[in-house]
Amino acid sequence: MIEELGLKVKTASKEAAKLSTAEKNTFLQKLADSLVENTDRIISENAKDLAKAKGHGISEIMVDRLRLTAQRISDMATGLRQVAELPDPIGQVLQGFTNLDGLKIVQKRVPLGTVGMIFESRPNVTIDAFSLCFKTGNSVLLRGGSDAIYSNMVLVEIIKENLLSAKITDGVVELLSDTSHAEAEKMMQADKFLDVLIPRGSARLINRVKEKATVPVIETGVGNCTIFVDESADLDMATRIVINAKTQRPSVCNAAESLVVHAKIADEFLPKLQNEINKVHEVEFRADERSLKALSAGIPATDEDFGMEFLDYILSVKTVDNLDEAIEHINTYSSRHSESIVTHDYFNAQKFQDEIDAAAVYVNASTRFTDGFVFGLGAEIGISTQKLHARGPMGLEALTSTKYLIDGCGQIR
């Protein structure tokens, strides 16, 4: 199956690269309308995934990742329209000059070619990934999780129906409907067809892709995000930020999983936070010995807890004596995604932003803002936690490479 699908997307990538900006934008606008028109059809297929998930006893938080409602489908359509309105990076000239030999040298943006996307649970990723790849002249091979197979299949069917209506080869998007681990590993090693592979999901998925892939990988997604509440923090502000980052949507990668508190304010802040956060939703605190003394309820934290992406109403807590200790702790356990400090000390804020090794580092704000739309990129294909090629929310430019065009008049060397 991989051989067949890989050849289709590889062949289609040549046509995708030739599409004009107007053709791409018109198609994305029509696809947005089509999603809304097919809302009932999409919800009907999504219901099969939801029923299967509930039958397997999956938590409500994880079921919510699968769920497509009329509003979420409308949001997906809005995302398509926003991508259509973004500037097209393909063909953009980054630099141009004439060298001492008289050669005219131009560097411009070009598509990556064929993109492989392996992801879990969220069917909206199907639309996000396709829209960004299509806008940048790439073809894409998608492999979603078995838990969202019916949703992913109907979304790709709708995309393909619209491609055929627009007389664009439908090979610019293919879905690996065999969700077995064996087929996934074949996809990870399909380097004769795929130019890049982007995994988006759990730490287990991403680590498996890194271990097995021969296709170049852009690592995304694992979000063990931490908030440090400094001794000078406004405790009301800190409480609001932590509650938002932990409870607003705990199943996403930019939710806070860990809290670090300065010892000088721990006895005042931790009881206040625990009281206020439990009014929103009961949260389990997994805390070190010092933090437990300030909490009315909690369980002892293990080292593993400080590096864990819970994706649930669970928060690890660490009390530290100073900023340096906080930075050391965060850099030790961080997934390099998003970290935040709540402080009124300008120098501590600057030191934190300078020394924390993460894609996004906040001062006095929730980690929940790490998102392609918020950062002005439109939809995102993922949030890269590595440093090569792309880092942070990956928008259109992250799905491009560059090419040098050199014009001469007989020069030799």
UniProtKB/Swiss-Prot annotation:
Subcellular location: Cytoplasm
One GO term describing the cellular component: cytoplasm
Chief place of localization: cytoplasm
Enzyme class: oxidoreductase
EC annotation from Swiss-Prot or TrEMBL: 1.2.1.41
Entry keyword annotation includes Zinc: no
Entry-linked PROSITE patterns: PROA (PS01223)
Reaction(s) catalysed (UniProt annotation): L-glutamate 5-semialdehyde + phosphate + NADP(+) = L-glutamyl 5-phosphate + NADPH + H(+)
Keyword vocabulary terms for this entry: Amino-acid biosynthesis, Cytoplasm, NADP, Oxidoreductase, Proline biosynthesis
Family according to the record: Belongs to the gamma-glutamyl phosphate reductase family.
Name of the protein this chain belongs to: Gamma-glutamyl phosphate reductase
Organism: Lactococcus lactis subsp. cremoris (strain MG1363)
